[in-house]
Amino acid sequence: MSTPTGSRRIFSGVQPTSDSLHLGNALGAVAQWVGLQDDHDAFFCVVDLHAITIPQDPEALRRRTLITAAQYLALGIDPGRATIFVQSQVPAHTQLAWVLGCFTGFGQASRMTQFKDKSARQGSEATTVGLFTYPVLQAADVLAYDTELVPVGEDQRQHLELARDVAQRFNSRFPGTLVVPDVLIPKMTAKIYDLQDPTSKMSKSAGTDAGLINLLDDPALSAKKIRSAVTDSERDIRYDPDVKPGVSNLLNIQSAVTGTDIDVLVDGYAGHGYGDLKKDTAEAVVEFVNPIQARVDELTADPAELEAVLAAGAQRAHDVASKTVQRVYDRLGFLL
């Protein structure tokens, strides 16, 4: 694998909690990764350890881990330019997480918004210690690789702040041990919203699947969802996310998958109605997902190539992260 000279290291990952990424993942996080891999030392991970904070069927988890990695490759992540691996195959993540947990205040961990929200929904009996310590494992994910930059959305910014705090706390006792990562604000990518609730981000946590465009769904189903997308009672097609969120979301989607500027799209719809917009957007999405689905099918039908990519990625990840763990263990006084 070639790494650009003088490039800064980045780390990011996605949980394998479903059989398909959705369009928001593809045009948001993964599109950012594709753009970053050329001029960064990039580590992209399938974070399966994080997935087990809720019960998982073992066979489903194995399948979803492989299919998530396959979608990384199909969307343009290049193992010749980035390290792609599965979290559980690199022991350094859990080794470092225990140490960092011993440098994380209970009060700070208790204030993590995602934990408070999820534990409130699940109730105390159903809430696991794993969910509570989830941000500490995230910190280990990042700090194990001497990561300099982390591309994060607003929902993960608090967790990155915890990682920074823990690294600084460790360094205050053992100077120069851990690299303190910075937030990376990538170039603007498309923000894709739920088709049925276009004021909310497209997300697997939505109450219904009707607003999601899953990359690996039957294209006919995706087209049907787009034709049923919420719009408004007006007739004119213009880009105005505040007043016309549904129409603006469809324009965003079509623009993102075709590379056509939104203003050009709007001009082309002069005198046309929402039916035309939905039809064209559906056709554009189907054209976008078809080659992705074909590549995923190819990789999963004969997984030798995919498994080789993940094995090579895990080895490189281990080579890097184990040095961090060894450095941390040495500073703490552990026998090596």
From Swiss-Prot:
Subcellular localization, as worded in the UniProt entry: Cytoplasm
PROSITE patterns (UniProt xref): AA_TRNA_LIGASE_I (PS00178)
Motif ('HIGH' region): 16-25
Binding of ATP, residues: Q15, P16, T17, G24, N25, G153, E154, D155, I192, K201, M202, S203, K204, S205
InterPro entries linked: aa-tRNA-synth_I_CS, aa-tRNA-synth_Ic, Rossmann-like_a/b/a_fold, Trp-tRNA-ligase, Trp-tRNA-ligase_bac-type, Trp-tRNA_synthetase
Enzyme class: ligase
Sequence motif 'KMSKS' region, location on chain: 201-205
EC number of this enzyme: 6.1.1.2
This protein's UniProt keywords: Aminoacyl-tRNA synthetase, ATP-binding, Cytoplasm, Ligase, Nucleotide-binding, Protein biosynthesis
Main location: cytoplasm
Cellular component terms (Gene Ontology): cytosol; plasma membrane
Catalytic function, reaction form: tRNA(Trp) + L-tryptophan + ATP = L-tryptophyl-tRNA(Trp) + AMP + diphosphate + H(+)
A Pfam family matched in the record: tRNA-synt_1b
Binding positions (L-tryptophan): D141
Disulfide links within the chain: none
An individual GO BP term: tryptophanyl-tRNA aminoacylation
Molecular-function GO terms, alphabetical: ATP binding; tryptophan-tRNA ligase activity
HAMAP family named among the record's database cross-references: Trp_tRNA_synth_B
PANTHER family: TRYPTOPHAN--TRNA LIGASE, MITOCHONDRIAL
Record function comment: Catalyzes the attachment of tryptophan to tRNA(Trp).
Similarity annotation: Belongs to the class-I aminoacyl-tRNA synthetase family.
Quaternary structure, from the entry: Homodimer.
Protein name, UniProt field: Tryptophan--tRNA ligase
